């Protein structure tokens, strides 16, 4: 444990059966980002991914990914969890339901589907609604893609709290604060992505995601796995939350990046995002500013000047 292995996670001989409590990871995007090319030259990664190891076909990609999570199932202890951050993919005019197809395969392998959480990126996404604005007729509707899925799977077995004595449970309390009640408690999480070029990796997920998942699905001292370690976000957070960690990454540059970042301070942002709802007349013209038509839902407090929480309409 507490190591990053530089080889594929298709086989993880370093890990014994049932040795991992939780996996938090995000598989490579299918046909979206060329990680190899980015590793060679940060400025050169493309929206089309041509895999050198031969799984550029969608079915091959799904089978390859499912094979890795079959190995993850082996090393997960009974009752342990696996959190996967994954989104749908647009490619050559088609919209591929990657999260749903992968879920079907993982359930067939023996994973129990536990929860789905929607990651609302808030400030980033694939902008497509312009088509509808330019041609406002049925059949031209293509919504902006502002979300990814956080899929939670569980290995059959006793509930994890039943294997932890009462005193040890008290060492891993979940913070029940305003952020929890207004965001974490729901299955839609409003988390801004990592700003571009902040890390030398094309698509790191924000540290808030592994922070929440590790806090919610594991206890202090347990082991956390990331089979697609990338920039080391999961491993870094696991260490700070006093969990053991183990990662797998095939690109040596990213292994070195992860090893460096693990000891860095957490980058959890001081101000987190929540959704504050407001009412607007259903037929208000686009772009029209008529504050008199916007009515706040009773019971919601107004924003103060120091409140950096945006309102999502």
Q: Model-flagged regions — what are they?
A:
Residues 1-257, 273, 287-290, 294-313:
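Core catalytic lobe of class I
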Residues 259-270:
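C-terminal helical cap(s) of enzyme catalytic domains, especially alpha/beta-barrels
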Residues 274-285:
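Post-kinase regulatory C-tail/linker adjacent to protein kinase catalytic domains
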């Amino acid at each position: 444990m507490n190591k990053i292995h530089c080889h594929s996670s298709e086989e993880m001989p370093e890990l014994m059966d049932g040795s991992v409590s939780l996996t938090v990871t995000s598989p490579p995007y299918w046909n979206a980002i060329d990680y190899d090319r980015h590793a060679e030259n940060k400025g050169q990664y493309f929206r089309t991914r041509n895999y050198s190891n031969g799984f550029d076909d969608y079915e091959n990609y799904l089978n390859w990914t499912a094979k890795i999570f079959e190995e993850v199932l082996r090393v997960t202890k009974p009752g342990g969890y696996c959190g996967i951050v994954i989104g749908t993919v647009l490619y050559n005019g088609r919209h591929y339901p990657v999260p749903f197809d992968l879920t079907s395969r993982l359930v067939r392998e023996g994973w129990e589907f536990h929860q789905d959480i929607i990651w609302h990126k808030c400030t980033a996404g694939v902008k497509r609604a312009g088509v509808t604005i330019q041609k406002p007729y049925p059949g031209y509707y293509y919504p902006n893609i502002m979300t990814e899925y956080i899929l939670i799977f569980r290995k059959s077995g006793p509930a994890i709290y039943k294997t932890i004595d009462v005193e040890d449970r008290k060492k891993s309390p979940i913070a029940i604060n305003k952020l929890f009640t207004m965001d974490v408690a729901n299955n839609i999480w409003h988390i801004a992505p990592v700003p571009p070029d902040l890390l030398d990796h094309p698509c790191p997920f924000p540290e808030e995601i592994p922070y929440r998942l590790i806090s919610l699905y594991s206890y202090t001292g347990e082991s956390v796995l990331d089979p697609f370690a990338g920039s080391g976000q999961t491993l870094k957070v696991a260490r700070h939350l006093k969990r053991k960690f183990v990662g797998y990454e095939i690109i040596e540059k990213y292994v070195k990046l992860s090893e460096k970042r693990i000891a860095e301070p957490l980058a959890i942002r001081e101000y987190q995002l929540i959704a504050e709802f407001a009412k607007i007349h259903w037929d208000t013209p686009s772009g029209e500013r008529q504050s008199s038509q916007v009515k706040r839902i009773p019971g919601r407090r107004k924003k103060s000047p120091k409140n950096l929480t945006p309102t999502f309409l």
